[in-house]
């Protein structure tokens, strides 16, 4: 017997997709920046596809992939540096509070 879809209500403890996205964005703000960078690179390279000249399609796609990965890795590195810096500042504040 199938459930009546009109009567289904999600549990109260579950977040909807937008709330989950906002929560994860607050926890790690550089992830959406990395995703945005990848999308911008992909959109730009698709736009430039028309004027690629004599470059082979496979080479053009490889360059697009490398540029998008560079944006993602850059965002990951910025996130790691931000986390290390914030942990360092918290530790310094705790050390100053103990003295």
UniProtKB/Swiss-Prot annotation:
Extracellular side residue ranges read 48-61
The membrane spanning regions, by residue number, are 30-47, 62-84
Keywords per UniProt:
Membrane, Transmembrane, Transmembrane helix
Show where the HIG1 domain sits: 1-94
Keyword Repeat applies: no
The cross-references to Gene3D superfamilies, in alphabetical order and at most eight, read: 6.10.140.1320
InterPro entries hit by this protein: Hypoxia_induced_domain, RCF1
Where does the protein end up? Membrane
Instruction: Tell me the residue ranges located in the Cytoplasmic compartment per UniProt.
Output: 1-29, 85-99
* Main subcellular localisation: membrane
| GO terms for cellular component | membrane; mitochondrion
What GO biological process, any one, is recorded here? mitochondrial respirasome assembly
Keyword Cytoplasm attached: no
Indicate how the chain sits in the lipid bilayer.
Multi-pass membrane protein
Query: PANTHER family in the record, alphabetically?
Result: HIG1 DOMAIN FAMILY MEMBER 1B (PTHR12297:SF9), HYPOXIA-INDUCBILE GENE 1 HIG1 -RELATED (PTHR12297)
Q: What is this protein called?
A: HIG1 domain family member 1B
Q: Which species?
A: Homo sapiens
């Amino acid at each position: 017997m199938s459930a009546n879809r009109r009567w289904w209500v999600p549990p109260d403890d579950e977040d909807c997709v937008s709330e989950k996205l906002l929560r994860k964005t607050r926890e790690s703000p550089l992830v959406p920046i990395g995703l945005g960078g990848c999308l911008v690179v992909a959109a730009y390279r698709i736009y430039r596809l028309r004027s690629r000249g004599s470059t082979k399609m496979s080479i053009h796609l490889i360059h697009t992939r490398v540029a998008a990965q560079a944006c993602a890795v850059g965002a990951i590195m910025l996130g790691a540096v931000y986390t290390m810096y914030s942990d360092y500042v918290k530790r310094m504040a705790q050390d100053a509070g103990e003295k």
